[in-house]
UniProtKB/Swiss-Prot annotation:
PANTHER family: FANCONI ANEMIA GROUP M PROTEIN, HELICASE WITH DEATH DOMAIN-RELATED. It comes from the Eukaryota. Residues 696-763, 775-895 are annotated as: Disordered. It comes from Saccharomyces cerevisiae (strain ATCC 204508 / S288c) (Baker's yeast). The lineage of its organism: Eukaryota, Fungi, Dikarya, Ascomycota, Saccharomycotina. GO terms for cellular component: cytoplasm. PROSITE patterns: HELICASE_ATP_BIND_1, HELICASE_CTER. Belongs to the helicase family. Yeast subtelomeric Y' repeat subfamily. This is Y' element ATP-dependent helicase YEL077C.
Length: 1277
């Protein structure tokens, strides 16, 4: 806004809409000035935009939140004038006109200036327009200089002053102000060169690096060299889109004068691990998760942060970017740390992911203009999708005309900023005019059972290519878990879906990508985007709702060719898509649908119509064609051998399936338990009724009568009582003819042949008839004796003859010889000869031996007596996991899986279990991943923040406490008694070990050791322990409040600790009379001595033992450091000598991993301040210990009982803490030394520790009980 008499002389256009006036021509200059002031003169610094005065007043009423009384606008103007006057008085000669100018620019009247600020009557109306402008510009220049921004700005003056406008009386005083300033931004930048990209490529790929094609080269140069602020790229999956920004990022990182910090965002958590591995290889870039940036700020090292869309949309990230320059300037004292690229991968999801669009709303608040360039990448974003996706996040959208890759031009006008400038689209798919994914063989099949067909394909693939990998895309989370548990017996499986927490998704994805032994990744469609897996040769999709984008993304995982199968059930209808979603793919040619999606020219009737689909193999690689041929030959061989693989039933949508399977299929230790009760039950249930019927029919009437008579109440009671954990025993006791038959199903082919050979003709026929699925159905339908006979008679002569011909005396004899004499006699006495023969023949030598050895004569009698149909049925239902375990593992691997009988009590639990589950859910509700036991006790969030329990995991628990294997990981119960509930974020076991940590907070070493003995009945029952813990809930809360009031005062309210307030400290320690400088000098000297002597740090601070460990000082990362400590036995000595033995054996070792991430970040940022302090002290700067050595020091001090007792005696403001996280936080608070200078408490700790080690104890000796150490300097319990 321009003031002065000559305002009318300025050529001002009516560039604004004038509202509130009937005739705009009657609007005066004063009215226009008022409109400008109230509409365009208030700045929102968070967003970097202008706001109206009404909006600004609303902010004034609400902000700042912590101010008890808000300032009004007049008071804010007065504060502005005070700053202006201070600026003029501190840097320039006081000038009446110039002082008044600052006040007038703040909209103060002349009366206000004279009465309040003591200035004579003056207004800018008394001077000419040019002079008024000059005065205002000079005031603005002083303001910029006073704010310290003159290093970022320089003023270039151009002579614009008209002599006629200058009054004579002002000429002498204004000669040196005849130039008007124009403020321009200085951006330090090292010149870029095309050679930078080539050097980056050689760093990443070696000296033989070359671009894929000319399109990739030119586009890479466009991103790095051109000033285009926003670029969108569509390239086919597998093209190398990552290198388009990876190489420019490496080139930016090589610049010495500017540090560029860039951000990459991907749609799903599963892509994080893969992206960080790819982008961090060769050490060319420092890569970190964006969560570190959001929680802790910029660390000064990272080149690229990687996150997901939810991070991009978060308010915390938006605020960090808005305050970037201020934070960097204050933290690093430089303006040479800049925001580089904002990269968004698979950005089409902003438009196509309808169900997530509400989560993307926060992205519109992001200051895109703060970044040097925005890059949007996708393999499935045609112009219409790309334009809508960009507009959805607040950008202008695509430029009207799509740019040709061969017509790259620099933009003429970029002054509007990134957010208002249209995005240039580079469509490499249209440029190349080729249908993507032609290198993949795509097959669409309708099948009876999708899982069955998928399993056949996978087994055939791994037989052809044993080192290959595959991805299976399921439609629901329940289906994912069902398939994982069913297929685990065939190959190693990793499964992922959206209900897993973020850390678990990242961990499992990383495991599949890096572990060469993992074969199959099963998941929902989130596993199909962006992930790059070596050795991937097959993708199978079982989703009927698959749209064209999901299809292209899924097939695109096959980088170097392979097979993609789209399996759908016969007579099934594709589900209706939601509003706004793309429709499912149609029947017919896949290539034609891909062409239509990308807008490519149709080639109907021409050569090349089918590309990798509809049986065409023209565009496939030789390796892919060879794989197809091998798969075809295996399929023919399987068909000839009639090997039917019966997989899971198609009903995967059972509501409670996740209760049983969730999180128990991911680790090797639980692989056996995945072959769970229901699978075994179904195996036994598949022994159809005809076998039992034929067995009973072969028992003569007299035997049946005696059998029924021997089944009494005592036998039933004994059977029921045996249903305990010893499943194997109960299974053996109830072995019947039916069970024997089911055992034979799991026997190798050789054993089956010998079994058949030892059976009479009638029985052999019956068994052979049941070898195929169709025959089994006919047998099940023929349950009476008459039809059984007809079934047997339908067996062709060839089979019977070949079976009989395989009968040898030796096999029969060996089978009978393996049956103990007692058992055989009791069996024969209760059963006819025919039954005995069939029993012996249906049992292989090994199985008969193990069964008989586990059954006494009495048990055998009761077993034989239970041969009626009812008892046989109960035997089948009670078959447990151990029945399968008795068989050969290799035999299990190759034999067919039978249908699962989903018995309600095994899948959903009994009514008592359901009731218990509901009670626990009500008592311990948790829906947040951050839920912890402190919240359950009733602590507020600000208290929980400082009474944190980070670093408390399963390794905190001693061995044997909540660490049983083979049980539910969430509640440590048997699977059929599991009380975990679907959607539970925090397991009962985790809450139990946190409750144990809370109890540790309140007990010293001896008391805690006794407590562990008292709760011994709960060592295997975390749920029972939680109930026991909850009874004392109020008492524990009150006790923590009392015992840790001092701790919360120091850490939460930051109350200052002064050594002069400690009477015992001043009287008994020289350290408490030292200045802050002396304490720091002593601290640096101790570390200098340790470094020179290569002393092992943890052992030294634990008991002053100066053992050498050179490997520790030479270690470059945390892993090598821990290995060095373990090699010299530090952790073992720590557990044997201190209270560390009350935790798990890995607890201390794991403290060096990621447990103390936030504390580590704070410490590493403080290293620069320590260096400045040393220089200020006038001493030669010494190396400050790196993080691992610093943490070793604090851990050693924590477990040094003698030192702890002395420190607590001397420093009266602190008391005992018994958890390592609390000790670490306490050690970083600041204390006032004797001269009132601040030093970190850990420096004071080292000084006290050094004083204890000194032979010359300073005046004022301590209590002998606290200070004496034995001659060996070992720390006792």
């Amino acid at each position: 806004m321009t003031l002065g008499n000559s305002y009318d002389a300025f050529n001002h256009d009516p560039w604004m809409d004038v509202v509130g006036f009937e005739d705009p021509n009657q609007v005066t200059n004063r009215d226009i000035s008022r409109i400008v002031l109230y509409s365009y003169m208030f700045l929102n610094t968070a967003k970097g935009c202008l706001v109206e005065y009404a909006t600004f007043r609303q902010y004034m009423r609400e902000l700042p939140k912590n101010a008890p009384q808000k300032l009004n606008f007049r008071e804010m103007r007065q504060g502005l004038i005070a700053l202006g006057r201070h600026c003029v008085g501190s840097r320039f000669e006081t000038d009446l006109y110039e002082s008044a100018t600052s006040e007038l620019m703040a909209n103060h009247s002349v009366q206000t200036g004279r009465n309040i600020y003591g200035v004579d009557s003056f207004s800018l109306t008394s001077v000419s327009g040019t002079t008024a402008t000059l005065l205002q510009e000079r005031a603005s220049e002083r303001w910029i200089q006073w704010l310290g921004l003159e290093s970022d700005y320089h003023c270039s003056f151009s002579s614009t002053r008209n002599a006629e406008d200058v009054v004579a009386g002002e000429a002498a005083s204004s000669d040196h102000h005849q130039k008007i300033s124009r403020v321009t931004r200085k951006r330090p930048r090292e010149p870029k060169s095309t050679n930078d990209i080539l050097v980056a490529g050689q760093k990443l790929f070696g000296s033989s690096f070359e671009f894929r094609d000319l399109h990739q080269l030119r586009l890479c140069y466009e991103i790095y060299m051109a000033d285009t602020p926003s670029v969108a790229v569509q390239a086919p999956p597998g093209y190398g889109k990552t290198e388009l920004f990876h190489l420019p990022l490496i080139a930016l990182a090589s610049k010495g004068d500017v540090k560029y910090v860039s951000f990459l965002f991907v749609p799903y958590t599963v892509l994080l691990a893969n992206c960080m591995i790819r982008l961090g290889r060769c050490g060319c870039l420092n890569v970190a998760p964006v969560r570190n940036f959001i929680e802790e700020g910029y660390d000064g090292v990272t080149d690229l942060y990687v996150g997901i869309y939810d991070d991009l949309a978060s308010t915390n990230f938006t605020d960090r970017i808005a305050a970037w320059e201020n934070i960097v300037e204050c933290t690093f004292r430089t303006n040479n740390v800049k925001l580089g690229y904002l990269i968004v991968d698979e950005f089409h999801n902003f438009e196509t992911e309808v169900y997530r669009q509400s989560q993307f709303g926060g992205i519109t608040n992001l200051d895109f203009d703060a970044f040097e360039k925005a890059i949007f990448l996708s393999g499935t974003a045609p112009e219409a999708v790309a334009d809508a996706a960009l507009q959805r996040i607040g950008l202008t959208g695509l430029a009207k005309k799509s740019m040709d890759i061969n017509e790259l031009k620099r933009s003429e006008d970029l002054s509007r900023g990134l957010s208002s400038y249209p995005t240039r689209m580079f469509n490499l798919i249209k440029e190349k005019s080729e249908v993507p994914l032609g290198h993949v063989h795509k097959i669409r099949k309708k099948v009876e059972s999708q899982p069955e067909e998928a399993l056949k394909l996978l087994l055939a693939l791994f037989e052809s290519e044993p080192e290959s990998k595959a991805i299976v895309v399921a439609s629901t989370t329940n289906e994912v878990e069902e398939l994982a548990c069913s297929w685990r017996k065939y190959f190693r499986v990793v499964w992922i879906h959206g209900k897993l927490d973020a850390a678990e998704k990242v961990s499992r994805t990383k495991e599949f990508v890096t572990d060469g032994n993992m074969r199959v990744l099963i998941g929902t469609k989130l596993v199909t985007e962006g992930i790059d897996i070596k050795q991937l040769m097959m993708v199978i999709m079982l989703d009927n709702r698959l749209n064209i984008i999901e299809l292209i993304q899924g097939v695109g995982r096959l980088r170097d060719g392979g097979l993609c199968y789209l399996l759908s059930r016969k007579n099934s209808w594709a589900a209706r898509n939601r509003k706004g979603e793309l429709p499912p793919i149609k029947e017919g040619c896949i290539t034609e649908q891909v062409r239509e999606f990308y807008g490519l020219e149709s080639k109907k009737g021409k050569k090349g119509q089918h590309v990798g689909c509809c049986g065409s193999r023209t565009d496939l690689s030789a390796d892919t064609v060879e794989l197809i041929e091998r798969m075809d030959r295996l399929a023919e061989k399987q068909a000839t051998a009639s090997m039917s693989i019966v997989a899971l039933p198609s009903n995967f949508q059972e509501s409670n399936s996740s209760d049983r399977y969730r999180k128990y299929c991911s680790s090797d230790e639980d692989s056996n338990t995945c072959i769970h009760g229901s699978a075994n039950a179904s195996t036994n249930a598949s022994t159809n009724a005809i076998t039992t019927a034929s067995t009973n029919v072969r028992t003569n009437a007299t035997t049946n009568a005696s059998t029924n008579a021997t089944t009494n109440a005592s036998t039933n009671a004994t059977t029921n009582s045996s249903t305990n954990a010893t499943t194997t025993a109960s299974t053996n006791v109830r072995t019947s003819a039916t069970t024997t038959a089911s055992i034979n199903v799991r026997t190798s082919a050789t054993t089956t042949e010998s079994t058949n050979s030892s059976t009479n003709a009638t029985t052999t026929a019956s068994i052979n008839v049941r070898t195929s699925a169709t025959t089994t159905k006919s047998i099940n339908s023929s349950t009476n004796a008459t039809i059984t006979e007809s079934t047997n008679s339908n067996t062709n002569a060839t089979t019977t003859e070949s079976t009989n011909s395989k009968t040898s005396a030796t096999t029969t004899a060996s089978t009978n010889s393996n049956t103990s004499a007692t058992t055989t006699e009791s069996t024969n006495s209760k059963t006819s000869a025919t039954t005995t023969a069939s029993t012996n023949s249906n049992t292989s030598a090994t199985t008969t031996e193990s069964t008989n050895s586990n059954t006494s004569a009495t048990t055998t009698a009761s077993t034989n007596s239970s041969t009626n149909a009812t008892t046989t049925e109960s035997t089948n239902a009670s078959a447990k996991e151990d029945a399968n375990k008795d068989g050969n593992a290799e035999d299990n691997r190759f034999h067919p899986v039978t249908d699962i009988n989903k018995e309600s009590y095994k899948r959903k639990g009994s009514q008592m279990v359901l009731l218990e589950r509901k009670k626990l859910k009500a008592q311990f509700p948790n829906t947040s991943e951050n839920m912890n036991v402190l919240q359950f006790l009733g602590f507020r969030s600000d208290e929980i923040k400082h009474l944190f329990l980070y670093g408390i995991d399963i390794y905190f628990c001693p061995e044997g406490v909540f660490t049983q294997y083979g049980l539910c990981k969430g509640c440590q119960k048997m699977f059929e008694l599991c009380v975990c509930w679907a959607g539970q974020k925090v397991s009962y076991r985790r809450m139990a070990w946190e409750a144990l940590a809370v109890e540790r907070m309140l007990r010293n070493d001896e008391e805690y050791k006794e407590y562990l003995e008292d709760i011994e009945p709960y060592h295997g029952d975390p749920v029972g322990y939680l109930k026991y813990f909850s009874v004392k809930r109020r008492e524990i809360y009150s006790q923590i409040q009392r015992n840790y009031a001092w701790y919360l005062a120091i850490t939460r309210r930051r109350e200052t600790i002064s050594v002069l307030d400690s009477t015992r400290g001043k009287q008994g320690s020289q350290v408490f009379r030292m200045s802050g400088r002396q304490i720091k000098e002593l601290y640096y000297k101790v570390w200098s001595n340790l470094r020179e002597s290569k002393t092992e740090v943890l052992q030294y601070f634990l008991n002053w033992d100066e053992k050498k460990c050179q490997e520790e000082w030479e270690a470059k990362d945390d892993t090598v450091f821990v290995e060095a400590l373990e090699k010299v036995g530090v952790f073992q000595r720590l557990r044997s000598m201190t209270s560390a033995g009350l935790q798990g054996p890995q607890y201390v070792k794991l403290q060096f991993s990621r447990h103390h991430r936030q504390l580590r970040s704070r410490y590493e940022l403080s290293l620069g301040m320590h260096l400045r302090d040393q220089i200020a002290l006038g001493v030669t700067p010494s190396k400050v210990p790196h993080w691992t050595a610093f943490l070793s020091m604090l851990i050693g001090l924590f477990y040094n009982k003698t030192f702890r007792q002395k420190l607590e005696y001397l420093l009266e403001q602190i008391s005992e803490v018994w958890l390592l996280p609390h000790w670490l936080d306490l050690a970083n608070v600041e204390v006032l030394a004797a001269d009132n200078t601040k030093v970190p408490l850990y420096m004071l700790m080292v000084a006290v520790h050094k004083e204890l080690d000194s032979d010359d104890v300073p005046d004022g000796r301590f209590d002998i009980i606290l200070l004496c150490r034995d001659s060996s300097r070992e720390v006792g319990e």
